[in-house]
Amino acid sequence: MAIKSDRWIREMSEKHGMIEPYAENQVRFNAQGEKLISYGVSSYGYDVRCAPEFKVFTNVHSAIVDPKNFDEKSFIDIHSDVCIIPPNSFALARTVEYFRIPRNVLTVCLGKSTYARCGIIVNVTPLEPEWEGHVTLEFSNTTNLPARIYAGEGVAQMLFFESDEVCETSYKDRGGKYQGQTGVTLPKA
């Protein structure tokens, strides 16, 4: 299994729609010249942006977190360019980018160091072969202070690994429950 370069990422995105929308360079400034947390293609990965759509965890209803029976009332919906995550809590969001993963590729997501160095951890499970959709992002605020997440700016990096052989059964073949997801998607048992 080999990690794929910027050339491969560019070709797959431009010719096959692997990443839409696709930024062919590292974007570091907005149209007004203000500094951003970078996004776009890098040497061996793609830095994704967070959409302005968040679900922030709250325990106002004294719910129990149960992945088999998740209570949607545990979240407050926020639509904003900035999301404040309470101390020792978390939020869900989604990428701006829509992904279509090739059958012979596994994609792994890592958080950006800009957030990690502030105690904000991004968690995403691997994007499996032939999975497609907006990626649901989980941000954990590990600090005792409120933490800020910026929509429209880089939050995590996707790494693409191409296998030497094509898998027998892809995520699409299995009818994966998160196939084609749009928006912030809550757990499904």
Swiss-Prot record:
Its EC number is 3.5.4.13. Homotrimer. It comes from the Bacteria. The lineage of its organism: Bacteria, Pseudomonadati, Pseudomonadota, Gammaproteobacteria, Moraxellales. It comes from Acinetobacter baylyi (strain ATCC 33305 / BD413 / ADP1). InterPro entries: dCTP_deaminase (IPR011962), dUTPase-like_sf (IPR036157), dUTPase_trimeric (IPR033704). It catalyses: dCTP + H2O + H(+) = dUTP + NH4(+). This is dCTP deaminase. One of its GO terms (biological process) is dUTP biosynthetic process. Catalyzes the deamination of dCTP to dUTP. DCTP binds at residues 112-117, 136-138, 157, 171, 181. Signal peptide: none annotated. The active site is at residue 138. Pathway: Pyrimidine metabolism; dUMP biosynthesis; dUMP from dCTP (dUTP route): step 1/2. CDD domains: trimeric_dUTPase.
